[in-house]
């Protein structure tokens, strides 16, 4: 995977608008794959009280770090954008290659590839660009189909999240006025004075280390709701299935040979612990007036066989189709405990054929990583809506 370099807002905007006017591909996104709306249907939903045009989005991952990533997903009909997880340690040396999607998905890359300050600017740029696109009229969107929401993600421990640099990032997303005003002069004159949204996001999905104890997860979520004022979604691990059930589903039912190490279960919450912590957090959410949900699921730790990703990494993180079954099993179990009162976000092996079923289950948002990293990229999203309409 190549190193990432932010593209100046002015040049990016000029390119997008000129390519739209020329009625050809936009950022190499095929014109025929543009999703302009439901054509009389209603695909809209809400995210913590914010109405959005569709429940689909890119999951937090390597493809949600740069402003142009978000624009491309928007062209494909995505309207809920899970932004790449950021953390205090933003100068990590990431082993490369760090992603393998030859069959299912594997990665050894678990944090942002930009500095915190760069990530803030990229997300603000992305929000501004989407508003410029809607204002331009070039996309020919159905009424209301421009509505979108950004969902933050931070990690990986309370000490890091409380650091002043991460705090500056969070508060910059809650009120981006300074960044917006600094970027306005880069825009073409007709768009400089648009009333851009100042709150880029007030919702957050918490990402924690594999092996993060339940007490730490609870402390972080309480802090984010009580002190920062964010709606929170707690991303949970497929290890909640427990070692016996996880291995039965993964190795016996699905037939995958990869080994889930005992260490993957060592410090992760059990299902019962997760139920208890979510129950307590429901009370915190009610007290603070914030929204609370859970997300299924994080990646699955498996042993790295060293045939593609660096052999120096003893573990790799699995995503894609096999994760779908493990995560859906947890959705069923959580629904058995909480009914429909607890919103569930879902990202695990979603592709065009199972997307309609996930939507029918009332999962919001339904987000995608591995499938969008395959040939066709963000344009693959348009096929999801073709399936949803049939």
Question: Predicted segment positions?
Answer:
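Short beta-strand/loop segments at the ligand-binding rim of alpha/beta enzyme cores
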Residues: 51-57, 289-292, 334-347
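Glycine-rich phosphate-binding active-site loops on the catalytic face of alpha/beta enzymes
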Residues: 77-90, 238, 357-384
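Catalytic cores of alpha/beta
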Residues: 67-75, 219-222, 349-368
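Generic long, charged, amphipathic alpha-helical segments
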Residues: 314-344
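C-terminal helical cap(s) of enzyme catalytic domains, especially alpha/beta-barrels
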Residues: 91-108, 311-312, 374-390
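Glycine-rich beta-to-alpha transition loops that act as phosphate-gripper elements at the mouths
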Residues: 60-63, 298-300, 342-355
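Active-site entrance/lid segments in N-terminal catalytic domains of soluble metabolic enzymes
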Residues: 2-35, 39-40, 44, 57-291, ...
């Amino acid at each position: 995977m190549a190193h990432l370099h932010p593209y100046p807002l002015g040049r990016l905007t000029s390119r997008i608008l000129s390519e739209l006017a020329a009625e050809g591909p936009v950022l190499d996104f095929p014109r025929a794959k543009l999703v302009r709306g439901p054509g009389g249907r209603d695909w809209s939903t809400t995210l913590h009280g914010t109405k959005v045009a569709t429940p689909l989005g890119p999951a937090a991952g390597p493809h949600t770090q740069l402003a142009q990533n978000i624009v491309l997903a928007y062209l494909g009909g995505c309207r809920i954008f899970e932004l790449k997880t950021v953390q205090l340690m933003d100068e990590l040396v990431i082993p490369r290659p760090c992603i393998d999607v030859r069959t299912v998905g594997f990665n050894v890359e678990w944090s942002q590839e930009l500095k915190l300050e760069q990530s803030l600017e990229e997300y603000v740029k992305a929000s501004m660009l989407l508003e410029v696109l809607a204002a331009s009229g070039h996309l020919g969107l159905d009424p209301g189909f421009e509505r979108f929401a950004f969902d933050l993600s931070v990690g990986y421990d309370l000490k890091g999240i409380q650091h002043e640099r991460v705090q500056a990032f969070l508060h910059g997303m809650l009120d981006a006025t300074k960044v917006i005003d600094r970027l306005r002069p880069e825009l073409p004159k007709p768009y400089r004075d648009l009333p851009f949204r100042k709150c880029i996001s007030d919702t957050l999905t918490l990402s924690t280390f594999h092996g993060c104890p339940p007490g730490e997860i609870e402390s972080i979520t309480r802090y984010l709701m009580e002190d920062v004022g964010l709606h929170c979604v707690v991303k949970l691990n497929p290890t909640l299935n427990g070692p016996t059930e996880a291995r039965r589903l993964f190795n016996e039912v699905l037939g995958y040979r990869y080994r889930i190490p005992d260490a993957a279960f060592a410090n992760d919450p059990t299902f019962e612990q997760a139920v208890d912590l979510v129950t307590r957090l429901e009370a915190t959410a009610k007290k603070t007036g914030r929204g609370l949900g859970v997300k299924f699921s994080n990646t699955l730790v498996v042993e790295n066989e060293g045939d593609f990703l660096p052999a120096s990494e003893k573990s790799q993180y699995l995503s894609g189709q096999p994760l779908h079954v493990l995560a859906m099993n947890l959705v069923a179990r959580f629904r058995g405990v909480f009914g429909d009162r607890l919103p569930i976000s879902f990202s695990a092996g979603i592709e065009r054929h199972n997307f309609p079923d996930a939507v029918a289950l009332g999962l919001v948002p339904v987000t995608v990583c591995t499938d969008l990293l395959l040939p066709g990229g963000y344009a693959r999203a348009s096929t999801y809506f073709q399936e949803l309409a049939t």
